[in-house]
Design a protein with these regions (language model features):
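Catalytic-pocket segment enriched in acidic/His residues
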Residues: 60, 73-78, 83-113, 118, ...
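Hot-dog-fold acyl-thioester-processing enzymes
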Residues: 2-90, 141, 151-163
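HotDog/MaoC-like acyl-thioester-processing domains
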Residues: 1-16, 99-104, 108-163
Length: 163
């Protein structure tokens, strides 16, 4: 068994200004949206009732914004937080545009800051900004987060590492 090498990133793999283009992209399905609504008890008709949505600003069902955030965060895991000790903070979450069933989303992340912890030098914090786009290259989501990253590959990952 081999691990995806991107999951083995430690603090020294991150540089300010570095941009990651995350794969794979994802086409949002009606089932994705419906399941997320059910799991989170979001029963707003804008996300599930075609007739109600037809009368709305966009004229069709809108994908739940918290699903879009969750999906885009998930896309970043292999490159950004695969070895994370913790996600410390999400901030400045902005829904920049609507997402509809059938949209194909992609994400990119820029490293804004990297610092070693003063109290625990075996780890550090990265601050990143992630942007989500649809198939028309329109930005649909932006957020920043701080992630606690180890300075060495965690013991659980060492069997998969070449170090």
């Amino acid at each position: 068994m081999t691990a995806n090498p991107s999951y083995l990133r430690t603090l020294d793999h991150f540089k300010v200004g570095q941009v990651f283009h995350h794969l794979p992209h994802k086409t949002v399905t009606e089932s994705d949206n419906n399941l997320f609504c059910l799991l989170t008890l979001n029963h707003h008709p804008l996300h599930s009732d075609v007739e109600y949505a037809r009368q709305s600003q966009h004229g069709r069902i809108l994908v739940v914004g918290s699903y879009v955030l969750s999906l885009i965060v998930g896309m970043t895991v292999p490159d950004i937080s695969g070895t994370a000790i913790a996600n410390l903070e999400y901030e400045k979450v902005t829904h920049d545009g609507p997402v509809f069933v059938g949209d194909t989303l992609r994400a990119e992340t820029e490293v804004l800051d990297v610092r070693v912890s003063k109290s625990k030098p075996d780890r550090g914090v990265i601050c990143v900004e992630t942007r989500g786009f649809n198939q028309k290259n329109e930005r649909v989501l932006t957020f920043r987060r701080r992630v606690l990253i180890p300075t060495e590959i965690p013991p659980a990952y060492r069997p998969y590492s070449s170090e």
